[in-house]
């Protein structure tokens, strides 16, 4: 496992129902991320609440009021609640209204999330961003390493458990290669992708014109059912290792 363990022994109260809340972007969200695959593993006597939203950064998730909704949930049952926090994709440059400064804003925003979860009496868990699945000459391209490193530093500084999903997902995707990695997307890979993947490359893919704006499309970031199940299990395994109190609720 690649979970970086700052493990704290947290005991559930007798008869308590543990709750796991997912906070993040589209790579975690319903329909496009690993959240559904993760929640499918969580036992029915625990609660898995996916509050991740596509297109959000550490800044915009708070600015639009989504974080207020999370904090509202923590007004009850906080001591038996773990909040998994994963951002990075939309904090990168070139995303107006969402991008954050890597050296200052991004870590500051993560610190604030962690500290507010702790103040509410709940348990924050930082998660480094899921890798993209873009290859060049057989090598997976690391486009999120600095954001993963920033999350690691904040976790170490604040004594919060951290799941290094970035490292483990990169290792897994590199091992499977471009062809297999292309099957994890929301839609089947088009012919140009299949041809490129056979040579160890990930060609650019234009978004197809469609009458349905919500129709799933192929890309190297988002996940279909297969990808959600694969990475959801990875996160569940990391969480079970990092937070022993949750192991009985994460059958693997």
Predicted regions and their residues:
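Alpha-helical cap/lid subdomain in secreted, periplasmic
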Residues: 68-252
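Short, solvent-exposed polar/charged micro-motifs at secondary-structure junctions
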Residues: 58-62, 173-176
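N-terminal regions of proteins, emphasizing targeting and processing segments when present
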Residues: 13-14, 121
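Residue-level marker of positions within ordered structural domains that often coincide
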Residues: 10, 43, 88
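Serine-esterase "nucleophile elbow" of acetyl-processing enzymes
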Residues: 15-60, 67-79, 83
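Sec-dependent N-terminal signal peptides
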Residues: 3-12
């Amino acid at each position: 496992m690649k979970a970086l363990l700052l493990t704290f022994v947290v005991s559930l109260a007798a008869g308590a129902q543990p709750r796991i809340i997912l906070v993040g972007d589209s790579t975690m969200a319903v329909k496009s991320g690993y959240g559904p695959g993760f929640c499918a593993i969580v036992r029915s006597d625990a609660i898995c609440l996916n509050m991740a939203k596509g297109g959000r950064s550490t800044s915009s998730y708070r600015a639009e009021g989504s974080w207020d909704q999370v904090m509202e949930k923590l007004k009850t049952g906080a001591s038996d609640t773990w909040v998994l926090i994963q951002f990075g994709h939309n904090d990168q440059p070139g995303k107006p209204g969402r991008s954050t400064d890597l050296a200052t804003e991004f870590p500051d925003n993560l610190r604030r999330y962690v500290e507010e979860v702790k103040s509410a009496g709940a348990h924050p868990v930082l998660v480094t961003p899921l890798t993209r699945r873009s290859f060049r000459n057989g090598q997976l391209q690391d486009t999120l390493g600095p954001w993963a490193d920033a999350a690691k530093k904040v976790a170490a500084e604040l004594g919060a458990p951290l799941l290094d999903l970035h490292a483990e997902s990169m290792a897994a995707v590199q091992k499977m290669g471009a062809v297999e990695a292309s099957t994890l997307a929301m839609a089947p890979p088009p012919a140009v992708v299949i041809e490129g993947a056979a040579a160890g490359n990930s060609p650019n893919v234009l978004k197809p014109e469609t009458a349905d704006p919500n129709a799933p499309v192929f890309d190297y970031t988002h996940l279909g059912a297969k990808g959600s199940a694969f990475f959801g299990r990875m996160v569940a395994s990391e969480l079970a290792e990092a937070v022993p109190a949750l192991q009985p609720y994460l059958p693997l």
